[in-house]
Amino acid sequence: MSLKLNKYSILELIDTPTELRQLTENKLQTLCSELRLFLLNSVSKSSGHFASGLGTIELTVALHYVYNTPFDHLIWDVGHQAYPHKILTGRKNRIYSIRQRHGLHSFPCRNESKYDVLSVGHSSTSISAGLGLAIASEREKLNRRTVCIIGDGALTAGMAFEAINHAGTIKSNLLIILNDNNMSISENVGALHTQCPQQKKYTNITSDIKKIINSNIYNKNKNTSTAIALFSNLGFNCTGPIDGHNILTLIHNLKNIRNTKTGPQFLHVITKKGYGYKPAEKDPIKWHAVPKFNLKSGILSTNKNIKYTTYSKIFGDWLCQTAMHDNKIIGITPAMREGSGMNKFAQKYPKQYFDVAIAEQHAVTFSAGLAIAGYKPVVAIYSTFLQRAYDQIIHDIAIQKLPVLFAVDRGGIVGSDGETHQGAFDLSYLRCIPNLIIMTPSNAYECKLMLHTGYHYQYGPSVVRYPKGCATNNILYPYNNTTSLYSIPLSKGIIHHQGQHIAILNFGTLLKPAYNVALQLNATLVDMRFVKPLDEMLIKKLTENHQAFITLEENSIIGGAGSGVNEFLVQNKLLIPTLNIGLPDFFIPQGAQREMLSELGLDSQGIYKKIVRWIKI
């Protein structure tokens, strides 16, 4: 797919910011309009993160116009908003490939472009890295400018506050731009958000921004927005709030700041997520990341082949059903309400629902307090974000044996968001924690049973780990919403096919391809269900009449469930040849889930080939 550039009279002339900086200021508004249209046309045909980029068109143009990139450093926090940046930095002819295998990365990536100073994907990292770069520049006497662009959603994370506190004392030449659009992925939450001078509803973006700015003109007494007051009190020179969709206003203020050499700077910019496309302006949550869509009608394409419900919805339905009978169950999410399937729960049980913002560490220890008080906290969190709260899991939950249930979504391959978002490590980093039980459902019914089991488990924390996407393994487990629930006996696995010679020990949702392989090889197939504790009795029994073991998981081989089986076999002097199949020792790149599972040899054909090749050695 390619996009016809001849209808973009100015944009087609720009391959790098060098050409951009040769334009006169009176042409920049036309460039912004063309860039917005180009983004609309490209994402509607390719899919991708959408609303955030629409809101940063003018800011992106202004930054590359004023600053001498790539010598000067621009750092985009998270990176959802960086599509316009990619288009202006030599990648517009490849923008259609974004998030696809061998295509452009979803987020800024150092390996992709010299203009991408920091590889990102997780939130709130920009200020820390930017401060390090600014200090290094000063020590090398490079006269380089460093600019961090962070959204008001990302500013809720503790790491951002830690960096701001440090930057205010160092007095380095660092500019922090707050892209204040009243949103993260969902609506923002927290006192910082509610105290900022940002209106929750817009009718006309230009008039609303003027109202906000006119009512909050900055003065030396610091009586403006909470954000400006915060930064000013921490030693920053503050400017704003200003209209983030007025290109000339942005350029004027950025030039003034660039020519100032007195310590750290803060610029408060008001933007609107989805700006310039009415459907995205009206519903920026829906249009945060989109499939292909009809640009004229605003109708998103749907996958007509989807026959089963998603694991996220299974979790959300279970949470609602459980809350009907228990007002002490508390659902907690760190700013991932929609993705984790908690919309319905948040609406039906608002007093039992907490969105703690992008604050994974706080989410976990907050759940500890609830558990101590006799409540039943359920933390719904993506695998890749749970990494950010590792100490809290150990120190605040596991050591104290607190009954907190972790619903770990996006375990395994997540697809198009790539290496920063793959759930490749959770079984490895959780398995070594004492007092923790880990369950890996292979289908919809098992997922609900395990959530039910974890909810009733009172002797410590429990984890139910499931992947992104649909629960398609109903071939082995008939299931519907009326099927009764019960607690699974701890550690107990299930033999699904009795074969000979080879035993396949499956952990999680690779059960369906494993079943096909077991039939081909006449191997015994076991759904282990528990990564911790293992079904040691079953493993011992299998060693008595099998000559080889295969462990199978959608997690890093190193330290994963298969490693747990290896450890048990060695400790008990059960010397049976064992092949561990899982994710290899490198960061898994982007690509569709099915595509990446095939490439990694984790579909039926790939698993079969790995086993046969190993047997022949």
Swiss-Prot record:
The record's family statement is: Belongs to the transketolase family. DXPS subfamily.
Q: How does it assemble?
A: Homodimer.
Query: At which positions is Mg(2+) bound?
Result: 152, 181
State any GO BP term from the record: isopentenyl diphosphate biosynthetic process, methylerythritol 4-phosphate pathway
Name used for this protein in its record = 1-deoxy-D-xylulose-5-phosphate synthase
The UniProt record lists the EC number as: 2.2.1.7
GO cellular component terms, A-Z: cytosol
One example GO MF annotation? 1-deoxy-D-xylulose-5-phosphate synthase activity
Q: Which PANTHER family match?
A: 1-D-DEOXYXYLULOSE 5-PHOSPHATE SYNTHASE-RELATED, 1-DEOXY-D-XYLULOSE-5-PHOSPHATE SYNTHASE, CHLOROPLASTIC
Gene designation: dxs
Q: Please, which domain of life does this record's source organism belong to?
A: Bacteria
The record lists the catalysed reaction(s) as: D-glyceraldehyde 3-phosphate + pyruvate + H(+) = 1-deoxy-D-xylulose 5-phosphate + CO2
